[in-house]
Amino acid sequence: MEFKNYIEIVEDWPKEGIKFKDITPLMADGKAFKSAVDEIVDYANTKEIDLVVGPEARGFIVGCPVSYALEVGFAPVRKEGKLPREVIKVDYGLEYGENVLTIHKDAIKPGQRVLITDDLLATGGTIEATIKLVEQLGGIVVGCAFLVELGYLDGKDKLEGYDVLTLMKY
């Protein structure tokens, strides 16, 4: 399936100069979204996944149906102040700013094989920070899966040594 047919490009959002890749048309088409999730699940099935981890917020949209299909848990990575129990945190940069990501301290057991999912790989800052959180808790990142990769931002360079799946590249 040609997933790019379901991505809307929004100019100058969230700020001038950004060409935002809107995945909501893909999500709105049940067959297209199922096909995208199925491709990630097929990839994950080769990895013996114990847990799916996804950063806020669109990583939840991708990760939850993948974890459901794999019959494994999902651990959310959230912005600072959004998780109610004890967390670990890491600072990170993204395509259009700076932020802090957190995960519950007990979200990952040492040795768990983790798939990280998100909608988009841009500069790689969000996923690099997510990997740091997973590894600080003793998880083993066995793959990263994205709907969209912005190749011109070289985010994949930050994921050297990790297996990466992207369904679309711009």
UniProtKB/Swiss-Prot annotation:
Q: What sort of enzyme, by top EC class, is this? A: transferase
Q: Give the domain of life.
A: Bacteria
A GO biological-process term: AMP salvage
Pathway assignment reads:
Purine metabolism; AMP biosynthesis via salvage pathway; AMP from adenine: step 1/1
The entry's protein name is Adenine phosphoribosyltransferase
Disulphide bonds in the chain: none
Which keywords annotate this record?
Cytoplasm, Glycosyltransferase, Purine salvage, Transferase
* Gene name of the encoded protein: apt
The family note in this entry says:
Belongs to the purine/pyrimidine phosphoribosyltransferase family.
Assembly, in brief, is: Homodimer.
State the reactions this protein catalyses.
Answer: AMP + diphosphate = 5-phospho-alpha-D-ribose 1-diphosphate + adenine
- A single Gene Ontology molecular function, please? AMP binding
Q: What does this protein do?
A: Catalyzes a salvage reaction resulting in the formation of AMP, that is energically less costly than de novo synthesis.
Q: Name one Pfam family in it.
A: Pribosyltran
Q: What is its EC number?
A: 2.4.2.7
Please give the GO cellular component terms listed in this UniProt entry: cytoplasm
